[in-house]
Amino acid sequence: MNSYFEQGGFYGAHGVHQGGGGGDQYRGFPLGLTYAQPHALHQPRPQDSPYDASVAAACKLYAGEQQYAKADCSKAGGEQQNGYGGKEAWGSGLGALVRPAACTPEARYSESSSPGRALPWGNQCALPGAAASAQPVQHQPTNHTFYPWMAIAGANGLRRRGRQTYTRYQTLELEKEFHTNHYLTRRRRIEMAHALCLTERQIKIWFQNRRMKLKKEIQAIKELNEQEKQAQAQKAAAAAAAAAAAAQGHPEH
């Protein structure tokens, strides 16, 4: 009874219950007052088994490895800004985060049965999985490779040839020759190919295209002439109809 009023039992209870057991802690604490030191709840209990000590040591080691891995990641991110070095450092950091057996969910639930123990590593045990799931989102490779089959294909899946461009001098000489002859002989084609630094095939294709262009021009001129004739015929018919109407409206006496 006298222990409740002693100085060591009222104000000096902290020094007493640290060295003693659970009974001394309760005996040195007044029932009518609230204790103002919450860290006393985290004191090890006397009935803890050696397995609890090994679990705490393993989780402490795991937390230390996580801090070391985070330091490596921050260091690599500061040195290299292009992203590839950070990715390698991130992978090496994940390799170091090997989850011990004590940090499994089963061990966490079994250890949480004691209400007086705190588990500060509960969130850290779930870090590697979340980081691994977020890694492919942050480092998605961009596919900008160009392959030959991506070019514009021609007939039968073959690659289309580029369009030949002619200089003004070459075009002028070809137009002058086409104005004289629409069809070239083999000898004349060879002479023009040597004179204009072109191949016989290019000369032949140019003349074919030029003849087709001339044919379209002639066809367009014919269509214009036909439209002109039709327009003149309609005008003549309209004029004749107007004259006939005028003649019917004013008969001759």
Curated annotation (Swiss-Prot):
GO molecular function, one term: RNA polymerase II cis-regulatory region sequence-specific DNA binding
Coarse class of the protein's main subcellular location: nucleus
GO CC term, one of those recorded: nucleus
Motif Antp-type hexapeptide, residue range(s) on this chain: 146-151
Short sequence motif named QA, residue ranges: 232-247
Keyword tags: Activator, Developmental protein, DNA-binding, Homeobox, Nucleus, Repressor, Transcription, Transcription regulation
Gene3D superfamilies, A to Z: Homeodomain-like
Cellular compartment(s): Nucleus
Superkingdom of the organism of origin: Eukaryota
Tissue specificity statement from the Swiss-Prot or TrEMBL entry: In the embryo (at 20% embryogenesis), expression is highest in the first abdominal segment (A1) with significant but diminishing levels in more posterior thoracic segments (T1 and T3).
Keyword Nucleus tagged: yes
Keyword Metal-binding applies: no
CDD domains recorded: homeodomain
SMART domains: HOX
DNA-binding residue intervals: 159-218
UniProt xrefs under InterPro entries: Antp_homeobox (IPR050296), HD (IPR001356), HD_metazoa (IPR020479), Homeobox_Antennapedia_CS (IPR001827), Homeobox_CS (IPR017970), Homeodomain-like_sf (IPR009057)
Cross-referenced Pfam families: Homeodomain
Single GO BP term: anterior/posterior pattern specification
Functional note: Sequence-specific transcription factor which is part of a developmental regulatory system that provides cells with specific positional identities on the anterior-posterior axis. Binds the consensus region 5'-TTAAT[GT][GA]-3'. This homeotic protein controls development of the cells in the posterior thoracic and first abdominal segments.
Family indicated by similarity: Belongs to the Antp homeobox family.
PANTHER family for this protein: HOMEOBOX PROTEIN HOX (PTHR45659), HOMEOTIC PROTEIN ULTRABITHORAX (PTHR45659:SF21)
Domain notes: The QA motif is able to mediate transcriptional repression.
Protein name: Homeotic protein ultrabithorax
Organism of provenance: Junonia coenia (Peacock butterfly)
Lineage of the species this protein comes from: Eukaryota, Metazoa, Ecdysozoa, Arthropoda, Hexapoda
